[in-house]
Regions:
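Solvent-exposed adhesion/ligand-recognition segments of exported proteins
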Residues: 5-6
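Leucine-rich repeat
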Residues: 13-16
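Extracellular beta-strand-rich, repetitive "passenger/adhesive" scaffolds
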Residues: 30-33, 52-54, 58, 72, ...
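Serine/threonine-enriched low-complexity regions in disordered or flexible coil/loop segments
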Residues: 34, 55, 76-77, 96-97, ...
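Short, low-complexity, Pro/Ser/Thr/Gly-rich segments in the mature regions of secreted, periplasmic
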Residues: 163-177
Length: 177
């Protein structure tokens, strides 16, 4: 389902509610002041969610996919209550947040540009690559290996113990909690 209103002057807002019984969802693109809320579990091979501006994306039930790709730009926010995936990719460009409350993945790539925040202490991942450019922050839970790269004042806090390879250019920090 795609709703667009480019170039239209709107003096009031319409609320769209889309209900479906499908548990399979492949891609979501939310922009503007849109909210996307999934109240049911989601399964599939791959799920990609892009959110920008002031969007709120909430996945309230378990997401179980082969690859989960979460992208935030601007000041959008995402909340995933529970996930299970082989490959997790989280990217923030701006001041948005991604909050992953519980679950596990086999490997994860976390990337923050500017001052966004990834909160993922509840998601255990054996292999993690985390890169921050700017003053963003990440709270993550690598169980075997962490490759951490910071350019700027970013902060990576991780649950340990784990093997850590780190490269910091600037005043950023990588610390075990």
């Amino acid at each position: 389902v795609l709703f667009r209103s480019k170039g239209a002057k709107v003096d009031h807002f319409t609320k769209f509610i889309v209900k479906t019984n499908s548990k399979w969802l492949k891609e979501v693109k939310a922009s503007g002041n849109a909210n996307f809320i999934a109240n049911s579990p989601l399964k599939g091979d791959e799920l990609k969610i892009n959110a920008n501006s002031n969007c709120l994306v909430q996945l309230k039930q378990k997401v179980e996919v082969g690859k989960l790709d979460l992208n935030v730009s601007g000041s959008a926010n995402m909340v995933v209550n529970e996930l299970k995936t082989d490959k997790l990719e989280c990217s923030i460009n701006g001041s948005g947040t991604i909050n992953l409350k519980a679950g596990n993945a086999e490997e994860a790539d976390y990337s923050i540009t500017t001052d966004g925040e990834i909160m993922a202490f509840g998601v255990a991942v054996p292999e993690v690559n985390c890169k921050i450019t700017g003053k963003g922050s990440a709270q993550i839970h690598p169980t075997d290996n962490l490759k951490a790269t910071i350019v700027g004042k970013g902060n990576i806090r991780y649950k340990g113990p784990t093997a850590v390879q780190q490269k910091v250019i600037g005043k950023g920090t990588v610390e075990e909690v």
